[in-house]
């Protein structure tokens, strides 16, 4: 019981909402934190290298010009149709721009937040990501097992499914054949590197 997030506990037990509603609100809360990182990336590129490092691994390197699309796409796939709500919350709790002391200052602050919301929303729609959660994987677990030439599933296949989503976000026009080719090449390259490291 101690593992249940406090927000979820309050919503489910105190407010007596359905478990699915509680989960949705917790997901919005989590996504709004991730949006804070995304806003920084979209507005200034300040954390580009940090985000890129999170997305990359030995099998997949995201091209620098596609980091924004992949990172935003992963957040939207988690939060789905509630992404605008999560973005709105993130903008509200975002560190304030300057210290507004008078009413005019507060109005300026609100205007800045409104502009920021519109700007980030436009960036996401320009990246063609609204509805990205409906994107079907080019390969299912069975097909991945075939490409990897393994007999059973497990964590390995799960990791490849996550990589596959990133690859598709980075290659929106990519075909199943191109995806399989990338997987084979990545696997071979990784094996070569491991052999070189051990010799």
Predicted regions: what is each one?
Residues 1-199:
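C-terminal subdomains that position terminal phosphate/3'-OH groups for nucleotidyl transfer/ligation
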């Amino acid at each position: 019981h101690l593992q249940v997030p406090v927000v979820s506990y309050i919503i489910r037990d105190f407010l007596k909402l359905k478990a699915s509603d509680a989960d949705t609100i917790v997901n919005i809360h989590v996504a709004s934190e991730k949006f804070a990182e995304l806003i920084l990336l979209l507005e200034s590129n300040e954390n580009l290298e940090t985000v890129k490092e999170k997305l990359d691994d030995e099998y997949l390197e995201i091209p620098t010009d596609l980091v924004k699309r992949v990172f935003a796409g992963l957040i939207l796939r988690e939060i789905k149709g509630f992404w605008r709500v999560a973005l709105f919350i993130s903008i509200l709790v975002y560190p304030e721009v300057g210290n507004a002391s008078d009413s005019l200052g507060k109005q300026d602050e609100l205007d800045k937040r409104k502009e920021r919301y519109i700007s980030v929303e436009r960036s996401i729609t320009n990246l063609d990501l609204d509805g990205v959660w409906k994107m079907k994987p080019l390969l299912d677990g069975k097909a991945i097992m075939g490409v990897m030439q393994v007999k059973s599933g497990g964590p390995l296949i799960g990791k490849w499914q996550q990589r596959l989503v990133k690859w598709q976000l980075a290659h929106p026009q990519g075909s199943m054949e191109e995806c399989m080719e990338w997987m084979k090449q990545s696997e071979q390259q990784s094996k070569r590197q491991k052999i070189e490291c051990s010799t």
